[in-house]
């Protein structure tokens, strides 16, 4: 699957993380929108559904897990790659139980992120628009 034109959403409360991930994904020919909160991302869904979402686990307000739960409750099958700075060993299983594709622990390499997104895109049915 080619990355050209596929829309990826980045949801992280830290602006530098959103900027860095957005830049990396754009260099890989993805279209990217960055959101500073889960609520902001969820509000965008009626307008445009991403092919994949990158979700921070821990955010103020609604967490990445809560975003994923709302997506699942709405039967919105968007592949999710979770990211975290936490070293909690239970998070890997929690991500899978929540329906996430996988968990990347910060800091991670550009290559690992791109491989994770590519793998996630092979598992879902998000929109290419």
Descriptions of predicted regions:
Residues 15-33, 98:
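Two-component/phosphorelay signaling modules centered on CheY-like receiver
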Residues 36-37, 62-66:
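Acidic catalytic/metal-coordinating carboxylates
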Residues 48-54:
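Active-site beta3 strand of CheY-like receiver
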Residues 59:
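Receiver (REC) domain active-site loop signature in two-component systems and cognate sites
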Residues 66, 87-102:
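Alpha4 helix (beta4-alpha4-beta5 surface) of REC/receiver domains from two-component response regulators
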């Amino acid at each position: 699957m080619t990355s050209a034109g596929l829309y990826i959403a980045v949801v992280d409360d830290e602006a530098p993380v959103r900027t860095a991930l957005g830049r990396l994904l754009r260099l890989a020919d993805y279209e990217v929108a960055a959101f500073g909160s889960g609520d902001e991302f969820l509000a965008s869904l009626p307008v445009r559904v991403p092919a994949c979402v990158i979700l921070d686990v821990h955010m103020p307000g609604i967490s990445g897990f809560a975003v994923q739960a709302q997506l699942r409750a709405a039967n919105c099958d968007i592949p999710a790659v979770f990211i975290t700075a936490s070293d909690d060993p239970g998070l890997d299983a929690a991500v899978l139980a929540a329906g996430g594709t996988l968990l990347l622990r910060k800091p991670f390499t550009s290559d690992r992120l791109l491989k994770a997104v590519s793998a996630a895109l092979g598992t879902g049915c998000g929109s290419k628009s």
